[in-house]
Structures are given as structure tokens and as C-alpha cells.
Amino acid sequence: MRTAVASPAALDSGRQEPLRVMVVDDSVVIRGLISRWIEAEPDMVVAASLRTGLDAVNQVERANPDVVVLDIEMPELDGISALPQLLAKKRNLIVIMASTLTRRNAEISFKALSLGAADYIPKPESTREIAAADIFKHDLIQKIRHLAAKRRRPAALASAREPEPRPIQATPVPAHSAPVLRPFSTHAPRALLIGSSTGGPQALMTLVAGIGPVIDRYPVLITQHMPPTFTTILAEHLARAAGRPAHEGVDEEIVKPGHIYLATGGRHMRLARKGTGAVIVLDDGPAVNFCKPAVDPLFTSAIDVWQGGILAVILTGMGSDGMRGGQQIVAAGGNVIAQDEASSVVWGMPGAAAQAGICAAVLPLQQIAPKLVRLFAGDHS
């Protein structure tokens, strides 16, 4: 294994040096596996491979990682206890929490996000699962790469996060050409659909807290890329944030105003017409866009129910899930709003929609909820 030596001038040179990744896990098997995956990537290097959170805290300054993959359950010092100490010792450190799919670990992962962790990833529970963990490998490498890319951009992006009131308009996109916006369709919205991935849990809680008047009168359906158990916990958090009922969608459940429906982990949430309304259909088919649940199945299936009466929001996340479904929503007469780059943890999904020219608005997260309230009240200005 090539373990990197810290280079303080890494970003001052003419080229960017490989991403430095610290792997912290008490399982030697998982540590070795993740380390080998990282070493196989041309743009990454293992900064350190450590057994406990205490080791990580003691060595983080010397190892100088860009990213830490941090297990939750470890001896001496567990991940949730090590997290604030690591962030205090290294500014802008990206920490990805790794845990098995238990309710306790899901709760801890959500707490870690509130304490400053950048993301989480579900970890295979046995060595037999690990040996064939292609999805785990794919997701981990992509998370490391995309989260680090955002942090490595000029600090000018950070200034755009300030929540000062600004006119409702498309936000300048620093690293891409400005998206071409469509005029808002005048179809009256009848349902709100939301898709999100990396950074989504925090963004969703901010969003639902500000759209109470919308939830009271219209159904809200959300697909967040997330595994089983985690979606159960997320629904509970969304209910508290919104002050309205929120739960995982149930097969053949009738969709009603006043409720938030969340796609359950491991199954796509689709919609089907029933009379004048809609029912939820849980789909155990193949992953779409490498995801299950995926956003596109929700978006496309909703058209059969509400046609042009759909308002879709695409929040922070990796990849392009939601873009194709958004295209079909727009073609049916609906509207799409995307989160802007500056306020996104990763501007993959919303960026794909914005660059495809299907958005009527590209907005900072803090401006999306007020805009939705106005749109559902009939104000399309």
C-alpha cells in the first residue's frame, strides 16, 4: 500500500495532488478492502489506515487527510465521539460516516450530520457481503470524489451561502455556464414532488419546515437516495421539522393532502391513478441511475395522475437522477425547480436539470420554500 506523506503545499502547486483519505475502522477486513479500493483510484491515496477513533484524533494533523471514512462503532473512542474532535483539529475536513444498517446506527448517522459530518454510507454487515459489495464501493468512491471536489473549489463559493434576502431569480453558477430558464407553466400545481441525494436530509428538513401551507393542501412525495432503516428515521425527522405527518409510503396507500410520503429504502416509489386520485405503488425492480429508490420513477409515474399539475424540486445530490423525469414533467406542462450550486453539497442532480434547460428557477435552498408557497397560492411571478 502506498501511504501518502502529507504535502502542505498540495493545492499551491500547478496541479492538484491526489485526494488524501484516512480510513478508520476497527475491522481489519473492511480497513484493508476500503484502502485497496482507494489505492486503485488514480486521484486518491491512503493518508492513514487506523483502528480506532482515538488513533484518528491523535494522527489527523500529521496525516493531513482531505477525507475521513469514519466507522461508528469502535473501541476506545467511537465515531460520533471522534467526529467533533477531528473537525476541530482540521478545518474543512470531509467526514463520511460508515455504519451497518441498524436503527441505532441510523440515528447516530443523522446526529453526525448535525454535528458536521458531510455524509454517511451504509456498510456491509459481513465479510461475505463485503466481497461482492460493488454498490458500496461505487457509492463510497463517488462520495469521496464529489464531496472533495466541492471543498477544493475557490472559497468564493462559500459567500453565496449567506442567507441574506435577495430577489428570487436564478443564481449565478460559478463553475458552469448560467442555465437557461423556462417560463413558469401556468398550470395550477396539484402535487409537490421532491428528489434528493447527497446532502439531501439536511436540505429536506430545511425545506419542509417552510412549506406548511403547501403540505396542508397538497400531497408531498419525496425520494431521497437512502437505504432501509435510514428512510424510517428520516421520515420521523421530517415529521418533526414540518410539524405535519410524514412516513414511508405503503403499497396501495391512497395519497392525500396534508401528508409527506417518503420512498422507502430499497424500493422505488411510483404512483398510479385510482379514480380521481393516486395510490402508491412500491416497485422492487432493478436500480435506476444506480439508485433504489430513484427519483425518475416517482417523477415519470406521477404524470399519469396529475399531468401538468406537478411541481418538482430537485435538491442536492450526485449524478443526474431526476433529470429525465423532470424533462417529461415539463413536456406534460409541469414545472421544475432546482437547488443552486452554491447551496448544494453536490451539484450533480440539480446541475443536470439546470444544464438541460428544464428549470423554471434555480434557487438557493433558503429561497425554495417561499417560492413554493407562492406558486401553490397561484402567484407565478
Swiss-Prot record:
SUPFAM superfamilies: CheY-like (SSF52172), Methylesterase CheB, C-terminal domain (SSF52738)
GO biological process assignments: chemotaxis
SMART domains listed in its UniProt record: REC
Residue stretches making up the Response regulatory domain: 20-138
UniProt GO MF annotations: phosphorelay response regulator activity; protein-glutamate methylesterase activity; protein-glutamine glutaminase activity
E.C. no: 3.1.1.61, 3.5.1.44
Keyword flag Manganese: no
Gene name for this UniProt entry: cheB
Cellular compartment(s): Cytoplasm
Swiss-Prot/TrEMBL catalytic activity: [protein]-L-glutamate 5-O-methyl ester + H2O = L-glutamyl-[protein] + methanol + H(+); L-glutaminyl-[protein] + H2O = L-glutamyl-[protein] + NH4(+)
InterPro entries listed in its UniProt record: CheB-like, CheB_C, CheY-like_superfamily, Sig_transdc_resp-reg_Me-estase, Sig_transdc_resp-reg_receiver
Protein name, per record: Protein-glutamate methylesterase/protein-glutamine glutaminase
